[in-house]
From Swiss-Prot:
Subcellular location: Cytoplasm
Pfam hit, one: Urocanase
Catalytic activity field: 4-imidazolone-5-propanoate = trans-urocanate + H2O
Full protein name: Urocanate hydratase
Function comment: Catalyzes the conversion of urocanate to 4-imidazolone-5-propionate.
Molecular function terms, GO-annotated: urocanate hydratase activity
Source domain of life: Bacteria
Enzyme Commission designation: 4.2.1.49
Residue numbers binding NAD(+): 49-50, 127, 173-175, 193, 239-240, 260-264, 270-271, 319, 489
Record flagged with keyword Lyase: yes
Biochemical pathway: Amino-acid degradation; L-histidine degradation into L-glutamate; N-formimidoyl-L-glutamate from L-histidine: step 2/3
Cofactor(s) required, per the database record: NAD(+)
Gene designation: hutU
GO biological process, one term: L-histidine catabolic process to glutamate and formate
Length: 552
């Protein structure tokens, strides 16, 4: 991949570079994904998650930008794995962009085949929100991480992580949310990463409190704050596959153990034991097969240590990076003895159509986001947990790129909020349109048997019809852009997922699209979980009037 050193930053304000606000939104969000404040390696078009890219190569990026600038309001741009391939006449209520990223026929859906195609320039890895142009930096996963640790606290520690120690690893774009999510729940956390730049970045953005290269110092500080029952987050430089076994050897058992290293990609995401970043980069180039094997061996040691900590009483869970699967394939037959985070903590939220709803101020003015915060506090005042989140986010979350906010809203709530936002744009309370989107990690938009759909009640973990139906209904209902991806989060062969974005530009047409899309999108989550036999989803569907023909 050619590296290009240029600073990309989304335009701000109300002057259009395109022929309409929906096209403008797509352009600004593509560029925002590559803002140095947002992207992990913008010079390589990498947004987050190992090699999750916004466009296939620099030529394709420029062609997408040029296409968006000339795209009419009754045309649709088609993007195939980060490359613009067609513009067709459609209609004003159709999506302006349709994206399909990293999709492979199942028999060929593996990293080896993907890399062959990538080498030929025929495909890119879109992760989830990288290739669908709705990544907002680490805040994008923060509330989900906060909810996960909060639910762990409720189930195991009396409702708070005060006086507990969490041990985790991986401080990239996704994992970087962990330190702040733990301290927001009152706990102490040691978060390990092999890359000093990742730790520095989290400290700079106030997601992590301190840095150390010493395990002894990390443990001393952690114990001090644990005793005081005060929160602190410690970024520890090192390799988790070395540090966790060392802690097991010393008989040190944290209260909570998880992991968010980029284990989904053994070649580009994970660093084997005994290698510096530079040595790893050299081996990756010279002998990728050996690199992958060493990575897998290190991951197996990593999981063995997590299992040992679980046996000694640590609450241990997989945070969705497929590390258990790798260890299992390497011969560790009890790798799945600890659960994934969705069945352990998140699925009840999915049954209510809840998920990571996000919005972005195209104006670039933080005041627009603060005004929308007030809407949440006013309109959802009875949801104290949600309001607490908004208040904490205002105080502790630093914006990356265009100002944005995330919060988990459910069926009915998303459409209500979208309507209000559109009215605020229409009456001038907000200075420019707002982009509304979500992660692909949502209640009804993903099939991922080792993550979002792990241990489904009816055994339908691998059924991939649901994300396809989600993308189809969002497209016909008028989402501004819709994406279908493969391999996000857990790697090639292990997931299919869909994303949507809708623009609130203050028009009556947008209001109708928002009502349709923000009803059917979370509605798919309720439907999917009703179909799998979850009582809470059935209750939600009946209470909200979701029309499900065969629901009993």
């Amino acid at each position: 991949m050619e590296k290009v050193q240029q600073t990309i930053r989304a335009p701000r304000g109300t002057e259009l570079q395109t022929k309409g606000w929906v096209q403008e939104a797509a352009l600004r969000m593509l560029m925002n994904n590559l803002d140095p404040e947002v992207a992990e390696k913008p010079e390589e078009l990498v947004v987050y998650g190992g090699i999750g890219r916004a466009a296939r190569n620099w030529e394709s990026y420029q062609a997408i930008v040029d296409s968006l600038k000339t795209l009419e309001s009754d045309e649709t741009l088609l993007v195939q794995s980060g490359k613009p391939v067609a513009i067709f006449k459609s209609h004003e209520d159709a999506p302006r962009v349709l994206l399909a990223n990293s999709n492979l026929v199942p028999k060929w859906a593996n990293w080896d085949h993907f890399r062959e195609l990538e080498k030929k320039g025929l495909m890119m890895y879109g992760q989830m929100t990288a290739g669908s142009w709705i990544y907002i930096g680490t805040q994008g996963i923060l509330q989900g991480t906060y909810e996960t640790f909060g639910e762990a606290a409720r189930q195991h520690f009396g409702g708070s992580l005060k006086g507990t120690l969490t041990l985790t690893a991986g401080l990239g774009g996704m994992g970087g949310a962990q330190p702040l999510a733990v301290t927001m729940n009152g706990g102490v956390v040691i978060a390990i990463d092999v890359d000093k730049r990742s730790i520095d970045r989290r400290i700079e953005k106030r997601y992590c409190d301190m840095y150390t290269e010493s395990l002894e110092e990390a443990l001393a500080v952690a114990n001090e704050y644990k005793e005081k029952k005060e929160p602190i987050s410690i970024g520890l430089l090192g390799n988790a596959a070395e540090i966790l076994p060392e802690l097991v050897k010393r008989n040190i058992t944290p209260d909570l153990v998880t992991d968010q290293t980029s284990a989904h990609d053994p070649l580009n995401g994970y660093i084997p034991v005994g290698y510096t970043l530079e040595e790893a980069a050299k081996l990756r180039e010279e002998d990728p097969e050996r690199y992958v094997q060493l990575s897998k061996e290190s991951m197996t040691k990593h999981v063995e240590a997590m299992l040992a900590m679980q046996e000694k009483g640590a609450i241990t869970f997989d945070y969705g990076n497929n590390i258990r699967q790798v260890a299992f394939d390497e011969g560790l037959k009890n790798a799945f003895d600890f659960p994934g985070f969705v069945p352990a903590f998140i699925r009840p939220l999915f049954c209510e159509g809840k998920g990571p709803f996000r919005w972005v101020a195209l104006s670039g003015d933080p005041e627009d986001i603060y005004k929308t915060d007030e809407v949440i506090l006013r309109e959802f005042a009875d949801n104290e947990h949600l309001c607490n989140w908004i208040r904490m986010a205002r105080q502790q979350v630093e914006f990356q790129g265009l100002p944005s906010r995330i919060c988990w809203l459910g069926y009915g709530e998303r459409a209500k909020f979208g309507r209000i936002i559109n009215e605020m744009v229409a009456n001038g309370e907000l200075s420019a349109p707002i982009v509304i989107g979500r992660d692909h990690l949502d209640c009804g938009s993903v099939a991922s048997p080792n993550r979002e759909t792990e241990a489904m009640k009816d055994g339908s973990d691998a059924v991939a019809d649901w994300p396809i139906l989600n993308a189809l209904i969002n497209s016909v209902n008028g989402a501004s852009w819709v994406s279908v991806h493969h391999g996000g989060g857990v790697g090639m062969g292990y997931s299919l997922h869909a994303g949507m974005v809708i623009v609130a530009d203050g028009t009556e047409a947008a209001a109708k699209r928002i009502e349709r899309v923000l009803t059917s999108d979370p509605g798919m989550g309720v439907v999917r979980h009703v179909d799998a036999g979850y009582d809470l989803a059935v209750e939600t569907a009946k209470e909200k009037g979701v029309n499900i023909p065969m629901m009993k």
